[in-house]
């Protein structure tokens, strides 16, 4: 066995022996199986909100949150084990050169562009000198994003039941009922026409007076904050489309436009090329070969899914569909 093979096996053994201990609350059974394979090189974490959780709210939304203290704990555990913290530029260099990192690595990525990325996550990453990437959906920054998941959650929290325009009524009196109702409504919303989402939502919830743009006015970053982050050595800004659509639900031309215009708008503000991308929602239900070809055509160097998995010798070659691990507190 050559030096490279010995290095990969050493890294694989290190991961199998240590990473499950570090991540024991967060790893799914799928992640555990992946980590047992030879050739595991590193893990790219996916986060959304860095803020305190609220046990009274819908778990589907709360699972997108990790507290600053928890993020700090994860960083400290990896530091203690001797893992390297890498930027996406460093990961890209590994992939392009074909030379893996000599030690297991961790990369942190955050999706969407929430304000708490700036107020809560940045201080933690700066404290420990850890690089990170924020994948920005530009409508979040332009305050045009419809955070329907927050609006629907509020609806379930403030009504004993929710009745949609087709006459179906969903109970909301208990915690479990609210959660079930949210999940049912979520599936229906994801199947709406993404090109006229607001109209579809208004039609579905015609009985209620909902300000679909209310949440983003409070929860989104500003362009000046994005620019400030982009100027920091630790932070990379990546693309995440314009409006965060389910890409499979729109035409090929519209999907390419969403990806391209999002990247161009970010580049316009940060005065830097945008080389990396994360797919909205990011599972095989929302993306496929068509989207991978668009990424290749646009010259994006690395694109990330929400699919659970670590970076391995095999999948690191597929730069349009790299997996991530969902960091869950």
Sequence positions of predicted segments:
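Intrinsic-disorder-associated interaction segments
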Residues: 1-4, 8, 12-13, 20, ...
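C-terminal active-site subregion of NodB/CE4 polysaccharide deacetylases
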Residues: 2-108, 116, 147, 153, ...
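Metal-dependent polysaccharide deacetylase catalytic core of the NodB/CE4 family, i.e.
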Residues: 45, 50-51, 103-106, 126-285, ...
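Short, well-structured alpha-helical interface segments that form or flank functional binding sites
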Residues: 73, 116, 120, 221-224
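Solvent-exposed, non-membrane alpha-helical residues enriched in polar/charged side chains
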Residues: 76, 111, 122, 226-227
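A broadly conserved amphipathic alpha-helix scaffold signal in soluble, globular proteins
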Residues: 76, 119-126, 202
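Conserved beta-strand->loop/alpha-helix structural units within folded catalytic cores of enzymes
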Residues: 111-113, 118, 128-133
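A short acidic, amphipathic alpha-helical/loop segment
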Residues: 120-124, 225, 290-294
């Amino acid at each position: 066995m050559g030096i490279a093979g010995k290095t990969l096996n050493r890294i694989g053994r290190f991961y199998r022996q240590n990473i499950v201990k570090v991540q024991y609350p967060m790893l799914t059974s799928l992640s555990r199986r992946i980590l047992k394979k030879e050739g595991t090189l590193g893990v790219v974490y996916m986060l959304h909100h860095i803020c305190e959780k609220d046990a009274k709210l819908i778990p589907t939304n709360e699972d997108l949150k990790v507290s600053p203290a928890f993020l700090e704990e994860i960083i400290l555990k990896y530091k203690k084990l001797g893992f390297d913290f890498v930027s996406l530029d460093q990961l890209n260099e590994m992939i392009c050169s074909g030379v893996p990192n000599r030690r297991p690595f961790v990369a942190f990525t955050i999706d969407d562009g929430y304000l708490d990325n700036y107020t809560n996550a940045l201080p933690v990453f700066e404290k420990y000198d850890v690089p990170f990437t924020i994948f920005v959906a530009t409508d979040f920054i332009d305050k045009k994003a419809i955070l329907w998941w927050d609006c629907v959650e509020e609806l379930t929290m403030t009504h004993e039941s929710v009745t949609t325009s087709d006459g179906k009524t969903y109970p909301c009196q208990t915690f479990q009922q609210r959660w079930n109702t949210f999940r049912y409504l979520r599936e229906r919303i994801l199947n709406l026409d993404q090109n006229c989402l607001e109209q579809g939502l208004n039609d579905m919830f015609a009985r209620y007076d909902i300000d679909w743009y209310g949440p983003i006015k409070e929860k989104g970053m500003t362009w000046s904050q994005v620019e400030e982050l982009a100027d920091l050595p630790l932070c990379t800004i990546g693309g995440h489309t314009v409006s965060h659509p389910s890409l499979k639900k729109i035409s090929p031309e519209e999907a390419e436009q969403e990806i391209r215009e999002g990247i161009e708008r970010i580049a316009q503000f940060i005065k830097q090329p945008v080389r990396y991308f994360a797919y909205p929602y990011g599972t095989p239900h929302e993306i496929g070969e068509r989207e991978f070809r668009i990424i290749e055509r646009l010259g994006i160097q690395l694109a990330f899914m929400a699919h659970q998995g670590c970076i391995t010798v095999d999948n690191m070659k597929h730069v349009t569909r790299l997996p991530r691990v969902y960091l869950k507190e």
